Structures are given as C-alpha cells and as structure tokens.
Amino acid sequence: FSSRAESGSAFQRLWEYCDILIVPGHADYCFDQKYGFRDYRGGGRSSGRETIGRVAAGAIASKLLGELGIVLTTYAKSIGPVTVDEADYDFTEITNNSFYLPNKDAAKKAAEYVSTLMEQMDSCGGLIECRVDHLPAGLGEPVFDKLDALLAQAIMSIGAVKGVEIGDGFQSASSTGSTNNDPFCMQQGQVMKTSNHPVELWVA
C-alpha cells in the first residue's frame, strides 16, 4: 500500500526563521549537537509536518479496526484553560468545531481564547483524550511490549507531546488500592468491568 499527501500549509516562510539562531522549545540544538547540522527552515524529521504520515495511516487503521467492531473516539478535553467536564460531553459536536471539543459552548470559548493569543502572537497547549471501545483482552506482550507501554512510546514520539496518562494517571498516586482497581463482573454472559480506572488514555 502506498499513499501521497500534500499539505497546503507546508509553505516555508524563510524570512521568519533567518534571524533565529536556535528555536526555543524545538530540537534545533540537539540536532546540531548530534549531527553537526540543523535545517533552520523547518520541515525536517523533528517538524510537526512529519505527523502527516501518521494521520493518513491512522485513518486507515481506524477503518480497519471498525470492521472488527473496535471503535476509536478521540477529542480535545481541553484547549488552554478551557476544559470540558465528562458530564458535559457531546460526541456529536466533535467534528462540528476546529478544536474537536465535545461541547459546543467550550468550542466557542476556545475559539475566543485562541483568537486572543494569536493577536498577541502567542500559543497554548491542550489535552487530548482517546477512548477505545470493544477492544479484545490479551493484546500486547509482557514487560517491554505491554499495550500501554507501546502506546506511550508511540505517542511520546510526537514532538509536541509532553505527557501521557493511562486511565486515572497521576491521580492514582492519591488513591488507594481498594478504589483504584476495576473489579470484574458478568453482564449478558460476558466478562466485564464495573469501572474504568486504569485504561483511559490522556495526552498532553
């Protein structure tokens, strides 16, 4: 299988980079130290443009998994200080706004916030949440190839990602062993869990 993708926003504005020796928060310095060269124009292996191949492959993978009954739902949980509480999720709104927020009001607030930052020539971060439904048990291998370990490695390889939480993540540190677990039960003849503490994926 082969594919080709063209990015309409990949135009390099060289004049915006020529006066910058080392770009803060980017891989410029590390690349220069490791390879003795860095491309100040952007677009190299450390560029966000590299993820276009992942987007294409991910779209195909999502379709294939759908044929197996596995459903992936990914959306922005927060944009800067604008956060959506789980009780206010409306998944029908995800594709109705450019931020993929599952809430109409939050999307409007995020648009206003980002617009203000753009006027100030600034930017912000966010939190992405991914849910997988109907995933079969037994995926992954012991120790280094556990499913959550492989997911964390793949996601952390994206340059802009600075943190990954599986399930309740760091909140588990303030929890107890008796509450931070998922007891098993039988529902309609199938083994199910009564809660979902350790398996929901958050990306920042």
Language-model regions, residue ranges each:
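Residue-level signal for pocket-adjacent positions within structured domains
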Residues: 24, 28, 35, 179, ...
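Intrinsically disordered, low-complexity boundary segments flanking structured domains
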Residues: 15-16, 115-119, 151-153
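Residues in well-ordered beta-strands of folded domains
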Residues: 1-2, 30-32, 75-77, 131-133, ...
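Glycine-rich, N-terminal phosphate-binding loop and its surrounding beta-alpha-beta segment
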Residues: 1-28
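Short, functionally important structural connectors and interaction interfaces within domains
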Residues: 21, 32, 44, 153-156, ...
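Glycine-rich anion/phosphate-binding loop at the beta-strand->alpha-helix junction
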Residues: 121-204
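Glycine-rich, mobile lid/loop segments that gate access to catalytic sites or pores
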Residues: 33-143
